[in-house]
Regions:
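Soluble FAD-dependent oxygen oxidases
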Residues: 1-405
């Protein structure tokens, strides 16, 4: 999403081209960025005056083993294209909430999507990668081959190399229930947040809910939820939606059964980034009364124009915290706020910081050093530093939350 003014954009067409680009770029005294879809909030996919390795030409999607639902996806593909390719098989992969996002960035950071509570994070569906390392070598990593590297790729891959192919195990998904619920929460913002959080946590794992709010408009605060039930049974869908609908007075609603691919249709053109987004991120175990109250104050302060909470839990918590570089497995919610100015958003957000037990790097633009330790617990960070020394000792890949030497 961040605009940039790079000096040179390289568009390799295959892994050997990516390797050649890395070997050349590392000899140049300018910043190096890697871009797949260019939609990333954190802004690591562009720079000013440097080199971008743009992966948009690597966009193939192929089924390599129907019996295990094994799918090979290149990083320049967009998630809406992946959904469309898998739909005829009755399969789907959880990703995010927008089909225009590129595979490469999301699938190396985490992936908090509409099927998250039933399928886990996107990285939890990953079975192997092909990756170009800082020295230009092309290697494979999986649980059986270079398992240390495979561990790091799942949550911090952008620090370790450029993934040129992902092998996922897709999930079996028929049509899904999708509902948009709109509430007027003006009179009780904090109470609504508590009730919605409790409803989400008590929902079966086939149900995932995303909440979007903004500052008051015409004196009203409106909350919109996007809710996905991984079922095509109408009675099941309605039973899952009712507790979410009961959290506050409804002023708008629609529900339908549709193919998963219809939720993440990609835009017709590649993303054209503009501006300098300012965002803050936090991971939350529960929406407590104290957090809800301070979040309501954040909204009324107008420091944020876009406030979103995504449901985690369910399958995302089945994975042990030390199994991947994304270690914050106790989190039930991902919280993100976008603001117009860094100073105002940081001031208000920092009052919430003590509620969080981590952050999601893809939603964070604050580059203060402590954000790195928020993103990765001490044991995880120590392990990542060891991997960095082994696979990228010269810190070729450093344009996002760089690990210190």
């Amino acid at each position: 999403m961040r605009g940039g003014n790079p000096g040179l954009v390289l568009q390799p067409r295959d892994p050997s081209g990516v390797a050649e680009a890395v070997r050349w770029a590392r000899t140049q005294p300018v910043p190096l960025s890697v871009r797949s879809g260019g939609h990333g909030i954190s802004g690591r996919s562009t720079n000013h005056g440097g080199i971008i390795i743009d992966l948009r030409q690597l966009q193939s999607i192929e089924v390599i083993d129907p019996s295990t639902r094994r799918v090979r996806v290149e990083p320049g593909a967009r998630w809406g294209e992946v959904a469309a390719a898998l739909a005829p098989h009755g399969w789907a992969l959880t990703s995010g909430d927008y089909g225009g996002v590129g595979v490469g960035g999301l699938a190396t950071a985490g992936g908090i999507g509409f099927l998250g509570r039933s399928q886990g994070l996107t990285i939890d569906r990953l079975r192997a990668v092909e990756i170009v390392l800082a020295d230009g070598s092309v290697v494979r990593a999986s649980e059986a081959e270079r398992p240390d590297l495979f561990w790091g790729v799942r949550g911090a891959g952008f620090m370790l190399g450029i993934v040129t192919a992902f092998e996922f195990e897709a999930g079996e998904v028929d049509d899904v229930g999708f509902a948009q619920l709109v509430h007027d929460v003006t009179s009780d913002v904090a109470g609504f947040l508590e009730r919605w959080g409790a409803a989400v946590e008590s929902s079966p794992r086939d149900t995932t809910s995303f909440l979007i709010m903004g500052p008051p408009r015409d004196g009203r605060i409106i909350a919109q939820t996007m809710n996905v039930v991984a079922s095509d049974d109408s009675e099941t869908i309605l039973s899952r939606l009712q507790p979410l609908a009961n959290t506050a007075p409804l002023i708008g609603q629609q529900a339908q059964i549709l193919p998963y691919e219809a939720l993440v249709v990609p835009p017709p053109a590649i993303h054209d980034a503009q501006g300098q987004p300012v965002s803050r991120s936090g991971l939350l175990d529960h929406i407590t009364p104290e957090f809800a109250k301070q979040a309501a104050e954040l909204l009324r302060s107008r420091a944020t124009y876009f406030f979103q909470i995504r449901a985690l839990g369910g399958a995302t918590q089945d994975v042990p915290p030390d199994a991947t570089a994304f270690a914050h497995r106790s989190a039930a919610f991902s919280v993100v706020a976008l603001g117009a100015t860094r100073t105002q958003l940081d001031r208000e957000w920092d009052t919430l910081a003590h509620h969080f037990n981590g952050l999601y790097v893809s939603f964070e633009t604050d580059r203060r050093p402590e954000r790195l330790t928020d993103a990765y617990p001490p044991a995880t960070l120590a392990r990542l530093r060891e991997l960095k020394h082994r696979y990228d000792p010269d810190h070729v890949f450093k344009d996002n939350f760089p690990l210190d030497r």
